[in-house]
């Protein structure tokens, strides 16, 4: 069965057909790294990591890029408050980000570009928009001419007239039209800045993603994803910038995950009700939070509370217990029983059911229901007077198959993603030191744990084998 996904651009489910057969170019908007991530940041990390896992499970070669915004107003404010420079703060919280999402079972992207490392590409992008007549300079600032782009508003499904009715030019802004948005901001005294054709300054938020997508993935990509709050203006503006420059469809499919509420109230820093991931995982198994997030369809809102997370723990434990019971019965059963084929068919039905749910817009909530049904049948099977090892093995392998996509583990023996990343870094260091014996040893160790490595020009990529 083919994958169908809900495309925000068309507001309907569509059959997934990548631009190039067998390959997927995927970009996910990453965090602004001025603080530890909260659970609202964790949701897209978990959701799109799972989407990537499933695309790979289906045989696609996925090129996955997710950025860091390592310079903007929030970072500058944090730097001033802490008496540190912007690069120091961003580096600290990038490291913390990897620790937090690694604990949640998220693999690193193939590339994690940062704004400060791609300033030349950003400036070049802005310069080309100016030369094509889609942008203009005003006293050191550069603005995008929103009305010059005919398709503006197509992602958020708003007309120019609707947008204009609520737009205002704030005091100090030097733009020609209230709908125009900043591509480049002139430097302010004491702020971090870069040289450009328009004087010292720094980029606007929206241009950063457009420039990095173009640099690392090209003019067109298959999937662009992020939180629902990014639909407008961020993703709308990305489309305008990129399509104005290239004349091509920027992204074929747009995926957006829903909001997170805290105790039935929208999470916001102004209300002081946001919850940091590193606080949660001090008290709970990090995999529990991932399981909790995936128990709701990615487009639906999630209501989070400590009570709900605690309630989820008992459900997660039931899966782990079923899996553990299978492991303990292995090698203590007979070789053949008379109804083996029926049970093997039952196990196979769960693979088909899992794929059917995931093919339908990555419905992890229903996919987890398939896991519980698998656990129920495993428990029934283990209650038999006589069991067969090859049937128990089939149950175990089906559990492993499903949870390898969902990204959590039911057994203690499986390596966490962060442990895999650490081993890969140790192997990379061995290769840099020309210690090929150690490098091969680590590769073989990972292979024995069903971890497949691929060395590319962009670095080492890995996936769990089927």
UniProtKB/Swiss-Prot annotation:
The keyword Manganese does not apply. It catalyses: tRNA(Cys) + L-cysteine + ATP = L-cysteinyl-tRNA(Cys) + AMP + diphosphate. Keywords: Aminoacyl-tRNA synthetase, ATP-binding, Cytoplasm, Ligase, Metal-binding, Nucleotide-binding, Phosphoprotein, Protein biosynthesis, Zinc. Its cofactor is Zn(2+). A motif ('KMSKS' region) lies at residues 266-270. The keyword Cytoplasm applies. Zn(2+) binds at residues 29, 209, 234, 238. ATP binds at residue 269. It is found in: Cytoplasm. The modification Phosphoserine is found at residue 270. One of its GO terms (cellular component) is cytoplasm. Signal peptide: none annotated. Belongs to the class-I aminoacyl-tRNA synthetase family. PANTHER family: CYSTEINE--TRNA LIGASE, CYTOPLASMIC, CYSTEINYL-TRNA SYNTHETASE. This is Cysteine--tRNA ligase. It comes from Bacillus subtilis (strain 168). The gene is cysS.
